[in-house]
């Protein structure tokens, strides 16, 4: 199957199957060792995804299978952008294996397009690099028990903190009342902040 056929099938399928991480309850994300694409694994046939899921479980990677119906696909594909995923690995380890870059399948609203309407260019509150690094970190951390955290996970943790500081934050403010605080019975006060 060529790439165009796979794209058409992804757009028109009644359902697709996705490998989900039990560690994050989100799509299982893999970094390709050659292209460095951050990929999710998608299959058209239930028996194929079950075979791949079984292989991953045998490798001690806790995963489950999720079915995405046609009416959920656009939402699913769009959410991959906010997760930092840039590629779909379709039917991995099969004759029909195909790598699809996410923008080839769905485009984002005009955030980065110069000719986009002004209402689409507004600031978006999202931090895909934080989300992606956190997914990799949790997938690896919860996969096995460590007596001490490996150096690779410590580096990911540092990257998460660096990405967190680059985030955009929104605080509520009421004219005349100032910044709202959530006061607890024990005297603690918290300021609500919304972030990516």
Predicted features, each with a name:
Residues 1-195:
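An interfacial alpha-helical scaffold signature
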């Amino acid at each position: 199957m060529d790439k165009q056929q796979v794209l058409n099938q992804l757009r028109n399928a009644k359902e697709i199957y996705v490998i989900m991480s039990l560690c994050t309850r989100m799509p299982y994300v893999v970094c390709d060792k050659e292209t460095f694409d951050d990929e999710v694994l998608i299959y058209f046939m239930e028996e194929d995804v079950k075979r791949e899921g079984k292989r991953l479980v045998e490798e001690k990677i806790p995963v489950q299978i999720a079915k995405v119906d046609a009416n959920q696909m656009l939402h699913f594909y769009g959410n991959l952008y906010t997760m930092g995923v840039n590629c779909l690995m379709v039917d991995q380890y099969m004759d029909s294996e195909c790598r699809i870059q996410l923008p080839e399948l769905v485009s984002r609203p005009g955030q980065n397009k110069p000719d986009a309407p002004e209402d689409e260019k507004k600031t978006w509150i999202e931090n895909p690099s934080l989300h992606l690094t956190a997914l990799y970190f949790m997938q690896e951390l919860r996969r096995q028990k460590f007596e001490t955290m490996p150096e690779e996970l410590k580096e990911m943790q540092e990257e998460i903190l660096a990405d967190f500081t680059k985030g955009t934050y929104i605080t509520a403010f009421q004219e005349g009342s100032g910044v709202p605080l959530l006061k607890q019975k024990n005297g603690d006060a918290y300021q609500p902040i919304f972030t990516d």
